[in-house]
């Protein structure tokens, strides 16, 4: 029997991007963010647009209950390598495209069971917009479709190297071969529905699963993906 085993695991992580190297400011702003949710023990990836004292920054994050895992290559790359801290490749730029159409639902606060569909009426201070983006064409390699205020519905599939990101649910009526990210921003109730699952990555509210770890019984099948009570991804095969 082998003494070493490598297994895949779905990990909940967050990416933190710093636009300042003032640790007092970082501590204050992070404290406000951490007080708003249950982030204690969260694994984090560090990105920065400015120079940092990386060791001090890592120590600061640890002291606040976070678990730094790696940095994004770029400004911090050389410093991380010098201390043998993991470095992840920088993001490849994708072409962000516009959806074929959008529908805006205006929900008055306090939330009621009714929502009215609006297209031109401006929002007031007591209203929340939920936007559904519709796209009729296949999402091609290098393209990204993003909706940070609601759901996305793809009426065709998506190619490898493409990406779809929504703060809410994602419905794909075709084959999925790219990256599908629902619940962006932490919406754990978000769900993913697709007609044929061959994704490079699926994620809901930061909990992700790469292609090799997707359960074999749902590959190339209609699938419903959601987070269970333990905040783990569940893959439910659908009968169509």
Curated annotation (Swiss-Prot):
Record keywords, A-Z: Cell cycle, Cell division, Septation
InterPro entries for the chain: CAP/MinC_C (IPR016098), MinC (IPR013033), MinC_C_sf (IPR036145), MinC_N (IPR007874), Septum_form_inhib_MinC_C (IPR005526)
Coiled-coil residues: none
GO terms for biological process, alphabetical: cell morphogenesis; division septum assembly; regulation of cell division; regulation of cell septum assembly
SUPFAM superfamilies xref list: Cell-division inhibitor MinC, C-terminal domain
Pfam families attached to this UniProt entry: MinC_C (PF03775), MinC_N (PF05209)
PANTHER family documented for this protein: SEPTUM SITE-DETERMINING PROTEIN MINC
Functional description taken from the UniProt entry: Cell division inhibitor that blocks the formation of polar Z ring septums. Rapidly oscillates between the poles of the cell to destabilize FtsZ filaments that have formed before they mature into polar Z rings. Prevents FtsZ polymerization.
Assigned protein family: Belongs to the MinC family.
Record note on quaternary structure: Interacts with MinD and FtsZ.
Protein name (record): Probable septum site-determining protein MinC
The encoding gene: minC
């Amino acid at each position: 029997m082998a003494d070493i085993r490598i297994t895949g695991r779905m990990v909940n992580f967050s990416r933190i991007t710093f636009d300042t190297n003032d640790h007092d400011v970082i501590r204050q702003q992070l404290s406000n963010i951490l007080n708003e949710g249950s982030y204690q023990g969260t694994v984090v990836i560090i990105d920065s647009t400015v120079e940092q004292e990386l060791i001090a920054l890592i120590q600061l994050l640890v002291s606040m209950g976070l678990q730094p895992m790696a940095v994004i290559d770029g400004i911090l790359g050389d410093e991380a390598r010098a201390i043998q801290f993991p470095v992840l490749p920088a993001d490849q730029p994708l072409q962000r495209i516009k959806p074929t159409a959008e529908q805006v639902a205006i929900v008055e606060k306090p939330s009621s069971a009714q929502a009215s569909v609006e297209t031109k009426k401006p929002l007031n201070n007591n209203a929340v917009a939920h936007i559904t983006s519709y796209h009729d064409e296949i999402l091609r390699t290098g393209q990204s479709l993003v909706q940070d205020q609601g759901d996305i519905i793809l009426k065709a599939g998506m190619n490898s190297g493409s990406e779809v990101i929504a703060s809410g649910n994602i419905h794909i009526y075709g084959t999925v071969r790219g990256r599908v990210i629902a619940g962006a921003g932490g919406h754990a109730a978000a769900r993913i529905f697709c007609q044929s699952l061959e994704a490079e990555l699926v994620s809901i509210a930061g909990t992700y699963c790469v292609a090799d770890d997707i359960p074999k019984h749902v590959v190339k099948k209609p699938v419903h993906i959601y987070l269970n009570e333990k905040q783990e991804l569940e893959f439910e095969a659908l009968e169509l």
